[in-house]
């Protein structure tokens, strides 16, 4: 196979060092450039065919400083720690939002205030919670704090920052406290016991809080009894079904602290800019301000951080020669692949000493961009080929730490990444962000773009569009993107299914009251009904002889409900993160090495026999998928193609392949809508080999069918037969229904508290339908819960 094709270029000219500038083949110059020079260079080289369809310039914003009021008195040790650790003068150099947040947290108010800080990327939100936490824990030897981050990388990043700060506490201080991480990477019993017994600031994630800390709370008596602060960072990540689970986990934590350990932690929440910060905070932690004695939540949105000038380019890949009038069915092949284009831009960034992140929507795209970029650099600047890497989920923890460190230090100049680096990990000063397709929300796009130009530095962001309708809409209507408001973050803590799951977990941790009272404060007005259902199913048991307690709300003695399950938390996946996974084992040499892991549900998509698996730019071929040992064997292979599995997903109601009875077709439209259990089955039948550069399929391999399935709930709308018969004469109704289903999926988060990955729809394949005409497929909209 040939290397990825480059777009046509004009005649080259020589630069000062004698290298060509890229107009007649790959740019071989390695002269450093600033952002403005680089944009001009792109216009003359890679974008010479008019790929830059819009330029948006965002003006700089100066810093707004503020000082703390006299009501807040920080200790000398705290002031010295931040001054020596990160060079921050807490007396005079705080941004306005930092000062507002610290005053709200440490100020003497009744009722006490929880705080939500919503500001832009790299605005110094961590100072808002680190200052009060450090000051309080230095002053009180019994006080503890819990930091909760959505990713392990963020936890490691915050650990490094806190250790630098605490290393600068004056030697005379006797109350310097221990900091520890408690997550899945801390595997030994000894290490976990050390964190529990001695550390006073513990960094974790919602998953570990759910499956380990709360169920084993009796091992955490010291920590929970002294809990003063709970930090929820990157709260905008807690949305949809995942956010609803996190909201119930937080309520379980509050319940144990209040009812068993006599503590009442103050919540400090930080978030990127969202449309509804106060409502989101209320939904997450459960304080809605409706009771006179209830804590209130203070919103801090006066972002005082500076921002440098940012140039934002919309980049539409060039049309292939003669492709401007292609029909719709061929349109996905009419442009140069955006994967190649973004790889060329990334290579140029590295060559001209601009530090860059290239955001990709999937792991496979991330690896492909790295492969293409290295191939380009080996041709144009071979000594820089190792200056790029990829970063995504599935890598071993040690490998992730090395990449983070090398990006921060400048050893790496470019990284192709999934949204794993979207959140606020400190990777140093970046110049450029690249975005391969729309990431799913305006908020995510700005969060990613905000990684470049931290503080006053000038920055560039380039959004490279696919040929799909959404990307092309933004390419043609840029104001629809740049004038769009930030989306709302949704959490539905009253989701009855999720409430039931977490009430079982809560009953395991501490038996529930059988009647309304204390526990309704945490689980809402549906708690009584949910508890009754769990009793009827035998999941909760009433034992008045053994469990009788005083209910202070009802002022009577009441029986308690105990959980009959041994480990209910293990049965609740808070974000479909699977405990089961396949190890990817490199068997290229006699010393086998685990290089990554793949979730069990994705194994048939990624590591089937014959699959091309890429890891840090290395191409490997999967030679064996061991289902019993859950291992995928891969070995090095020099191939110029990637593979795409062939599969079909079908939706059916358990008990029969047909969802509808014969009488359904005569019902009015309003009666054709149903909601019930749905079975989702995926059958894998083979794979295609796809050429890297052209993206053309050139071979197909079949293998014995394999299948996976899961049960969930769905809603569907049957299209009446009379409409089908009339419309089918003039239009492809099945394709229209398929398109409409995806349109509904995209619009659903605007009306329902869910994320874009929380729901799926029934998809139709014209080819498969023709091949498998023996199987009845009713024409319908069908949407199902992915969880």
Residue ranges of each PLM-predicted region?
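Extended, highly charged accessory segments
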Residues: 268-269, 465, 507, 514-604, ...
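Helicase-associated low-complexity/disordered flanking segments
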Residues: 1-100, 111-114, 177
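Conserved strand-helix element at the start of the C-terminal RecA-like helicase core
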Residues: 144-147, 151-158, 346-376
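Conserved segment of the helicase C-terminal RecA-like domain
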Residues: 443-492
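Post-DEXD/H (motif II) to motif III coupling segment of the RecA-like Helicase ATP-binding lobe
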Residues: 236-303
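Conserved interdomain linker/interface between the two RecA-like ATPase lobes of SF2 helicase motors
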Residues: 274, 278-362, 504
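Conserved helix/coil segment N-terminal to the catalytic DExD/H
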Residues: 184-228, 406
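Conserved SF1/SF2 helicase motif Ia
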Residues: 134-157, 175, 258-263
């Amino acid at each position: 196979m040939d290397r990825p094709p480059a777009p046509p270029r004009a005649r080259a000219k020589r630069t000062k060092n004698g290298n060509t500038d890229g107009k007649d083949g790959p740019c071989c110059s390695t002269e450093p450039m600033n952002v403005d020079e680089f944009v001009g260079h792109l216009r003359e080289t890679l974008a010479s065919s008019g790929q830059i369809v819009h330029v948006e310039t965002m003006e700089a914003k100066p810093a707004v400083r503020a000082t703390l009021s006299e009501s807040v008195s920080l200790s000398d040790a705290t002031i010295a720690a931040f001054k020596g650790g990160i060079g921050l003068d807490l007396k005079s150099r705080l941004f306005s939002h930092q000062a507002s947040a610290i005053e709200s947290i440490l100020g003497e108010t009744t009722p006490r205030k929880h705080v939500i800080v919503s500001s832009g990327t790299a605005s110094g939100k961590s100072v808002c919670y680190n200052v009060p936490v450090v000051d309080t824990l230095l002053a009180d030897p019994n006080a503890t704090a819990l930091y909760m981050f959505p990713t392990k990388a963020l936890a490691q990043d915050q650990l490094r920052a806190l250790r630098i700060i605490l290393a600068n506490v004056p030697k005379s201080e006797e109350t310097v406290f221990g900091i520890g991480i408690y997550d899945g990477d801390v595997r030994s019993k000894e290490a976990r016991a050390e964190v529990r017994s001695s550390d006073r600031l513990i960094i974790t994630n919602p998953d570990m809080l759910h499956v380990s800390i709360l169920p084993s709370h009796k091992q955490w008596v010291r920590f929970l009894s002294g809990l003063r602060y709970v930090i929820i960072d990157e709260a905008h990540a807690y949305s949809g079904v995942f956010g609803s689970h996190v909201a119930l986990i937080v309520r379980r934590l509050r319940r144990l602290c209040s009812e068993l350990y006599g503590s009442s932690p103050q919540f400090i929440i930080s978030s990127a800019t969202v449309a509804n910060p106060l409502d989101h905070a209320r939904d997450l932690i459960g304080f809605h301000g409706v009771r006179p004695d209830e804590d209130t939540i203070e919103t801090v949105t006066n972002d005082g951080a500076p921002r440098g000038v940012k140039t934002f380019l919309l980049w539409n890949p060039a049309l292939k020669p003669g492709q401007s009038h292609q029909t719709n069915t061929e349109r996905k092949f009419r442009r140069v692949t955006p994967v190649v284009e973004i790889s060329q831009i990334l290579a140029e960034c590295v060559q001209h000493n601009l530090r860059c992140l290239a955001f990709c929507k999937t792991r496979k795209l991330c690896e492909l961009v790295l492969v293409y970029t290295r191939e380009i650099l080996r041709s144009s600047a071979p000594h820089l080929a190792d200056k790029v890497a990829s970063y995504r989920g599935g890598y071993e923890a040690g490998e992730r730490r090395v990449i983070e460190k090398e990006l921060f230090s400048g050893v790496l100049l470019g990284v192709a990444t999934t949204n794993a680096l979207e959140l606020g990990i400190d990777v140093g000063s970046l110049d450029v962000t690249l975005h391969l397709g729309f990431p799913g929300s305006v908020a995510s796009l700005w969060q990613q773009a905000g990684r470049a130009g931290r503080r006053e530095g000038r920055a560039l962001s380039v959004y490279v569009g696919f040929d799909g309708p959404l990307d092309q809409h933004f390419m043609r209507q840029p104001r629809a993107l740049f004038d769009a408001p930030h989306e709302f973050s949704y959490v539905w803590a009253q989701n009855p299914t999720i409430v039931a799951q977490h009430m079982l977990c809560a009953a395991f941790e501490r038996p529930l009251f059988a009647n309304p009272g204390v526990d309704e404060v945490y689980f809402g007005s549906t708690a009584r009904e949910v508890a009754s259902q769990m009793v009827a199913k035998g999941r909760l048991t009433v034992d008045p002889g053994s469990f009788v307690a005083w209910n202070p709300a009802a002022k009577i003695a009441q029986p308690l409900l105990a959980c009959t399950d041994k480990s209910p938390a293990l049965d609740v996946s808070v974000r479909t993160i699977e405990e089961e996974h396949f190890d990817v084992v490199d068997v290229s040499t006699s010393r086998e090495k685990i290089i990554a892991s793949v979730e069990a549900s994705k194994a048939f998509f990624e590591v089937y026999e014959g699959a091309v698996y890429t890891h840090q730019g290395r191409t490997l071929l999967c030679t064996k998928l061991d289902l019993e040992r859950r291992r995928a064997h891969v070995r090095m292979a020099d191939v110029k193609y990637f593979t795409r599995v062939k599969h079909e997903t079908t939706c059916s109601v358990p008990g029969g392949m047909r969802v509808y009875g014969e009488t359904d077709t005569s019902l009015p439209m309003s009666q054709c809508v149903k909601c019930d259990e749905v079975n989702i089955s995926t059958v894998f039948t083979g794979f295609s080999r796809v050429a890297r550069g052209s993206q053309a399929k050139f071979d197909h391999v079949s293998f014995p069918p394999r299948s996976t399935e899961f049960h969930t709930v769905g809603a569907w709308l049957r299209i009446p037969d009379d409409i089908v018969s009339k419309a089918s004469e003039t239009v492809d109704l099945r394709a229209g229904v398929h398109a409409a289903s995806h349109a509904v999926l995209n619009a659903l988060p605007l009306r329902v508290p869910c994320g874009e990955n929380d729901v799926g729809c029934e998809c139709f394949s014209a080819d498969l339908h023709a091949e498998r005409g023996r199987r009845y497929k009713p024409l319908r909209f069908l949407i199902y819960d992915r969880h």
